[in-house]
Amino acid sequence: MVALMWGLEVVDAIAGGSLDQYGIEPRDDDGLTGVVAAPFLHAGFGHLIANTIPFVVMGLVIAFNGAMRVLAVTAIVTLVSGLGTWLVAPDFTLHIGASGVVFGYATYLISRGAFNRDALELAVGLIVVLVWGTALLGGLRPEDGISWQGHLFGAIGGVVAARVLRRGRTPAPV
C-alpha cells in the first residue's frame, strides 16, 4: 500500500495534482469512489511523509497478528472513515490522505487490548497513547485544510475493527 501511495504521488506531482480530484467529495455520487481512493492520494510529499511514518509503524504492529489482520483492520477503517467523511463533511470540499487510516490504526491498537482482555495489547495501546495521543487529540480539532471528519471517523473505525475482530468472538445464534 505504501508503495502505491508513493507511486501515485509521483504521478500526481508530474500531472500537476490532477489525481487529487478522485478524493472524497461529500454527498456527491461521484465522490463515493474517493472512499477507497482517498487514502492513496496526498496533497504533496510533505503530507505523504506525515502519513507514511505512523502508517508503517502502526501497520507493522498490527501485522504481528498476521497479514489478514492488517488487511481486515485497513478495510474496516477505510470504509468507516471514508463513508463517515462522505456523509458529514461540508459540501464542496475534497478529502484526501491516509490520516483517517492512521487514526483508525491508532484507536484499534489502543482499544483492542480492552476487547481481548490482553495485558500485552493494553501495554501496546498505552504506548500508542503516549507517543501519538497529542496528535490524535489535535487532529480532531476543526482546522482549515485538515479533514477532522476523516480523523474522527477513522478513529471510530479503529474501535469498530477492534470490536469486530476481537478474539474469542462467537457467532450469535440464529
Predicted regions: what they are:
Residues 1-174:
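A detector for small-residue-rich transmembrane helices and their helix-helix packing motifs
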